[in-house]
A protein has these predicted regions:
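Surface-exposed acidic, glycine-flexible loop patches that form ligand/cofactor-binding
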Residues: 42, 89-94, 250, 263
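Hydrophobic h-region of N-terminal signal peptides that target proteins for export
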Residues: 7-17
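Flexible, glycine-rich phosphate/dinucleotide-binding loops
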Residues: 14, 111, 192
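N-terminal low-structure segments adjacent to metalloprotease catalytic domains
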Residues: 17-53, 71, 75, 300-322
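Juxtacatalytic substrate-recognition/specificity segment
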Residues: 25-28, 46-175, 285-294
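Acidic/His/Gly-enriched intrinsically disordered linker/tail segments
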Residues: 45, 122-138, 153, 173-322
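Bacterial N-terminal signal peptides that target proteins for export
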Residues: 1-6
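A generic alpha-helix preference that emphasizes hydrophobic side chains
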Residues: 14-15, 99, 180, 258
Length: 322
């Protein structure tokens, strides 16, 4: 699920320090580029919709989209299972269906009618095992007031929801800060057309957050939802928290979640190893088993480390209830 705001207003402290002799659990990718896949496009449907079929997905577009753009979007869509399957973390936990449906809804009315939540722009429907995307937002996302660039499709929105689809059988076993944060992590790493960049993550995340939470900047500081509040949210509470942010910036919880995932994956080999082991462990558990707690740390400690780390990288943060 991804909520985005729809209106835009006019000495280093090392988080990543590794102990001497520590090595990564597995080699971390520096980049990833999706392999070409076979596509079938049907633009002769009775209801006027466009249908694209690929090895993992069947995408239906309610609005007219050029074949070249459809081909590119399908390449982005297919890149996600390729990436998640090959990633060193045990994230892939595929849907029961071999083909996942994606519906590009023409507007919010169609999106909500199909089962999406009002105010959201992307939605993973776990019951029907399909992805819903608001095409009006996806194809022309809001731009900052002083931007002279033509709006480009928000391919990161596709990546976010399809990460959920790729992890669907594990979502209920993981806290929402991790499932939403990891989806945003891959979304930020996606550079377009199924190409992902995992090096220079500090710059990618910093620049992304400067845009995404620009309206929450006071002076030189960006105001975020506190770490203790985010770590304590249930999946149902997450939806409420996203919908209730002052000023309508539903992205704020995602911003903190993104920083938390970066902390657990790039905050040293020990944190990454614990995260990796936990992800592997939960895949083998029966629904009857009690779910083990996610291996994290004291929230106040993490929050202090985040403030210090990102301040040395050009992102001044204040964690405060809005």
């Amino acid at each position: 699920v991804l909520y985005r705001f729809l209106i835009l207003l006019i000495f280093p402290v090392s988080l990543l320090a590794q102990r001497p002799g520590e090595t990564p659990v597995e080699a971390w990718p520096r980049s990833f580029k999706a392999k070409p896949v076979d596509l079938r496009i049907n633009d002769k449907t009775e209801d006027g919709s466009l249908v694209v079929e690929s090895p993992h997905f069947r995408m239906v577009a309610e609005t007219r989209i050029g074949r070249q753009d459809l081909t590119r979007f399908a390449r982005v869509v297919e890149s996600v299972p390729q990436l998640i399957k090959s990633h060193p973390l045990r994230l892939w936990n595929s849907p029961r269906k071999s083909i996942t449906n994606i519906l590009l809804c023409k507007d919010e009315t169609s999106f909500v009618k199909a089962g999406g939540d009002e105010g959201a722009v992307g939605w993973w429907d776990g019951h029907k095992e399909r992805v819903l995307i608001r095409s009006d937002y996806f194809l022309a996302p809001p731009q900052t007031e002083n931007s002279r660039l033509q709006a480009q499709p928000d391919e990161g929105l596709l990546v976010h929801e399809l990460v959920h689809a790729s992890m669907s059988a594990s979502l209920w076993r993981l806290p929402p800060w991790f499932t939403e944060g990891i989806a945003e992590y891959f979304s930020v790493c996606h550079q377009g057309g199924g190409w992902y960049l995992f090096r220079d993550l500090d710059s990618l995340i910093r620049n992304h957050l400067r845009r995404a939470i620009s309206r929450n900047k006071v002076g030189e500081h960006f105001h975020l939802v506190p770490v203790p509040s985010i770590l304590a949210l249930s999946h149902q509470d997450w939806i409420k928290a996203s919908q209730s942010q002052p000023g309508g910036n539903a992205y704020l919880p995602y911003a903190t979640a993104l920083l938390l995932v970066h902390y657990h994956l790039h905050g040293g080999a020990e944190r990454r190893a614990k995260t990796s082991a936990h992800l592997a462990k939960i895949q083998g558990l029966s629904p009857r088993n009690k779910m083990p707690a996610f291996p994290t740390e004291e929230p106040g400690f993490i929050q202090k480390r985040l403030v210090n780390y990102w301040s040395s990288r050009g992102l001044q943060l204040i964690f405060r209830e809005q």
